[in-house]
């Protein structure tokens, strides 16, 4: 954990900054990014945080129907300006926007209207077809994740979007088969974990290509195995992992979940139990 990284503005769904959006923000932070979630409904009510019952759905759709997209872009720009003044935000790599649902449409508009954006990613944005003429202004990378069965984006509309944007080499559109709107919302009724994981991987891949962070994974692995098998230093081995790691040695189903359990496993059952004359012989490597 270096305490800083490329800056991302995260744009909410129509349900405000709720537990789902905080979880999304944490995922991006774990990938090495400094991210801020924009409160898009602050002009109506500060800190709106809705769930997914019938009453909250109705309130969310009312907020959406009264939402001004132009003002939303102003809010994104203001959040980008705030990011640029944070010491945790890397200043020399450029800024990005990631959005879901309403935020997915705004991510598209931000790519069209904010020239400083290096990368924008939109998940199942609603209404992009109404602003396709603005695509000619996109200067950075744009990635769109689209649900094949999105009830808010019929097949004909989706095809129109993809056909129009296919003319731009810096735009990449992905279709996820047999899933509906909000397929990447954890715990939601349309959540589809395989599609969500693939979309997340594609999002992070696009971000890393455009703004980083660029990790030398091979060097990190070499350091990890050196501490684990050569110097046999448990604390140093643990330092090469994330804060709460998970290791499962498949043949014996041993290992640990979390720092405390895994550290205990290494200290008492693994690192110091390997033969002193053991050597490492690389066979293959996939990064």
Annotated model-derived regions:
Residues 1-90, 185:
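Serine-hydrolase catalytic machinery in alpha/beta-hydrolase-like enzymes
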Residues 13, 100-104:
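Short, thiol/selenol-centered motifs that function as redox-active sites or metal-ligating centers
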Residues 40-44, 126, 179:
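Short beta-to-alpha linker loops that shape the active-site pocket of alpha/beta-hydrolase fold enzymes
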Residues 76-80, 158, 200, 204:
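Generic structural signal for well-ordered alpha-helices
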Residues 87-101:
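Alpha/beta-hydrolase fold nucleophile elbow
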Residues 104, 143-149, 155, 174, ...:
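C-terminal and inter-domain tail/linker signature
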Residues 104-115, 120:
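Short glycine-enriched nucleophile-adjacent loop
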Residues 119, 125-177:
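The feature captures the conserved acid-bearing segment of alpha/beta-hydrolase catalytic domains
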